[in-house]
Amino acid sequence: MSLLAQLDRRIRYYGGLIVSCQPVPGSPLDNPAIVAAMALAAEQAGAVALRIEGLANLQAVRPLVTVPVIALIKRDLHDSPVRITPWLEDVNALAQAGADIIAVDGTRRQRPASVASLLAAIHRQGKNAMADCSSLDDALECWQLGFDMVGTTLSGYTAEGTPVEPDLALVKSLSAAGCRVVAEGRYNTPAQAAEAMRCGAWAVTVGSAITRLEHICGWYNSALKAAVCPANEQ
């Protein structure tokens, strides 16, 4: 049975939650052993797959879990805004470290390696490919190229001003176009994740609301401060 067929079965049984274990950089949780522990806990709690960034984290996670791992490498390049798995060398390294699915930036922005060449490299390694996209056009182009899944990962993150709500309209449009779509980006409540599935998502990736303690504490602190110190008393 193919990996995607296995995932289809897990999604039907467990519900389609992919957990992204990517701590805030520099956080006390930003440690491969801790990332691996979070990943194992997520698997035991019913995650159908995991999203892991960085070779060290992937190498720590892979021996502990049996669910598929979506892996990527983030880089800050001086000559390109693309951060997610920008180099062909990254694809090869992730494949050798045990990634099942390799995620790359699927936008049309200036980049060191073309989207098509990254896709070809992933498939040469016998891995499934995920395109992290920002728009309907990006995602449809990647799907037509032959990506195994497209994510709404970068919707709202490639221009000024990040929306608060997830892009459910993009999920719905991609599903209607026949894409295997992973809803990702700002799914901070179970209700939002469930709505994405109702809009046709194949699965939903949740990161900050599960694995970024600083973000979760920030949400609670903001709400509590507003309750304790209303604007008219500040």
From Swiss-Prot:
Keywords: Carbohydrate metabolism, Isomerase. One of its GO terms (biological process) is N-acetylneuraminate catabolic process. Gene3D superfamilies: Aldolase class I (3.20.20.70). It comes from the Bacteria. InterPro entries: Aldolase_TIM, NanE, RibuloseP-bd_barrel. Its EC number is 5.1.3.9. The keyword Isomerase applies. It catalyses: an N-acyl-D-glucosamine 6-phosphate = an N-acyl-D-mannosamine 6-phosphate. SUPFAM superfamilies: Ribulose-phoshate binding barrel. One of its GO terms (molecular function) is N-acylglucosamine-6-phosphate 2-epimerase activity. GO terms for cellular component: cytosol. The keyword Iron does not apply. Pathway: Amino-sugar metabolism; N-acetylneuraminate degradation; D-fructose 6-phosphate from N-acetylneuraminate: step 3/5. Belongs to the NanE family. Converts N-acetylmannosamine-6-phosphate (ManNAc-6-P) to N-acetylglucosamine-6-phosphate (GlcNAc-6-P). HAMAP family: ManNAc6P_epimer (MF_01235). This is Putative N-acetylmannosamine-6-phosphate 2-epimerase. The lineage of its organism: Bacteria, Pseudomonadati, Pseudomonadota, Gammaproteobacteria, Enterobacterales.
